[in-house]
Amino acid sequence: MQILTLITALPGAVAQGLIWGIMAIGVYITFRILDIADLTVDGTICTGAAVCIMMMLSGHNVWISMLAATLAGMLAGLATGIFHTFMGIPAILAGILTQLSLYSVNLKIMGKANQAINVDKYNLLVSLRHIKNESLSKNTIFIVAVMCILLIAILYWFFGTELGCSLRATGCNPNMSRAQGINTNMNKVLGLMISNGLVGLSSALLAQYQGFADVNMGRGSIVIGLAAVIIGEAIFGRIFRNFALRLLAVIFGSILYYLVLQIVIWMGIDTDLLKMLSALVVAFFLAFPYWKGKYFTKAKQGGK
């Protein structure tokens, strides 16, 4: 185990962390703001990647392809929202149904189980090759970092508007929101569309970065997103109180997740166990507040 090998691999881990961080922000919107466990993510990841790759293979501009991937993700969120609000299906089951449907959709989009794209033949925005020894205009880490900052700024502005505040109120207290005349069903659909749109954008970047799209590339994505959210909150929660900084904490959580993942691989731990380790990490951080309240909080004495 040479330390130089680990150092060489760290920039790639940071790049992946930034890309998946955009997806994690989407998960944050549903999980923390709307208080919905949305499992559509596992299918949307592949849908966005498939749309982006196929459009670029058809000769479309990279920005147009990424926009199409984002819109495809928003349509997936719309489907989940309709299942949940219009048809009365529980949110978690609605996400599973959409995810299941997207598997067939993704196969139809790509025509087969996977599609590759060559960085030498196509003008990709990001790539695994463009991490080191590149100018800032081509450096993957710099480009994705700028995109993350812009997205956080846009989301910070949006959730400060009247519509954004009503969306946050819907997740915080839906009954009170309805009493104030807020259309909570519409807000849930909108939140799911924004969330999955971000997932679609993230997957478009991921497909370019790794050079292919695959129907199984989204498996376990929700665990990665939750891990980024939970790690970011656990480490930076006491420091980052502002909404924009909380979104930034999610990005940092994603980067830390991939840095730890890279260290685990460098240490020679069986990679087949990585998904299980990720699930255990998420379970631990989700359970910690409960354990803290139940086992470590001193009982109040004499009504004090």
For each feature predicted by the language model, list its residue ranges.
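Alpha-helical transmembrane segments within multi-pass membrane transporters and channels
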Residues: 60-100, 105, 148-149, 252-253, ...
